[in-house]
Regions:
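A short acidic (Asp/Glu
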Residues: 15-20, 59-63, 89-93, 107-109
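A generic local structural motif
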Residues: 35-38, 64-69, 82
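Active-site-proximal C-terminal subdomain of hydrolase catalytic domains
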Residues: 78, 86-190
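A domain-level signal for caspase-like cysteine endopeptidase catalytic cores
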Residues: 1-50, 79-80
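A short, glycine/acidic-enriched catalytic loop
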Residues: 55-74
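Active-site-proximal beta-strand/loop segments in catalytic clefts of secreted hydrolases
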Residues: 9-11, 52-54, 81-85, 99-101
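Helix-loop-strand module that forms the ligand-binding subsite of alpha/beta enzymes
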Residues: 68-88
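A generic structural signal for alpha->beta connector loops
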Residues: 25-27, 75, 93
Length: 190
């Protein structure tokens, strides 16, 4: 797969572990600071968009929000990797590989109800590094293959962080997204 790729990854030390995901791509446009950038124009100029970092159901902090959904809907093989990205993808009827709540820091583990005696900074770092390495290994593959690779190899083996995160990795394919758009349209126009 040789797509013109755009990467949104806000410059943030706490998400540097995600850099290997796009380090091996052919020249990609990497945006780490959205100031003075026309995000919509950048999205329009690329075949796929990889979005990484911290976020919420409304988007990727400092980079992507609801105003970008129509443009993202025209792209293929997008990756949405931030906390609650799945809610953003589903709400806007998008497709791609996405994560739900994704623990990448010890505070997030505590917030997510993981018992404190079952993890450490080491286990969180191990989970982060393994996830990024596995995504990087199949970044050129079709999304169903990347998704299967993650499910096959991002295994808990006693790590509650990986167990939690693994359950929240989803591949949202065009059929499901199309049904969501139809459902939304029906709701808006009874």
């Amino acid at each position: 797969m040789n797509l013109k790729t755009l990467v949104f990854h806000h410059d943030d030390r706490s998400t540097d572990f995600l850099k290997p995901i796009y380090a091996g791509l052919p020249p990609a446009t990497v945006v780490t600071n959205s100031r003075h950038q026309n995000m919509g124009e950048l999205i329009s100029q690329h075949d796929r968009v990889i979005m990484l970092g911290h976020g919420y159901p409304g988007g990727l902090f400092f980079m992507v929000d609801g105003s970008h959904a129509a443009l993202l809907r025209q792209k293929r093989d997008n990756l949405y990797i931030w906390c609650h990205a799945d809610a953003y993808v589903k709400h806007h009827g998008l497709t791609g590989l996405t994560t739900g709540m994704f623990i990448s820091e010890t505070a997030e583990a505590k917030f997510s109800g993981i018992p404190a005696n079952t993890y450490s900074q080491f286990t969180v770092t191990h989970s982060n590094d393994l996830f990024a390495r596995l995504v990087a290994e199949k970044i050129h593959a079709p999304l169903p293959e990347l998704h299967a690779h993650l499910l096959d190899h991002y295994q808990p083996k006693g790590c509650p962080i990986i167990e939690y995160n693994r359950k929240r990795i989803q591949l949202i394919e065009p059929v499901a997204a199309s049904a969501k758009r139809t459902q939304t349209t029906a709701t808006l126009h009874p």
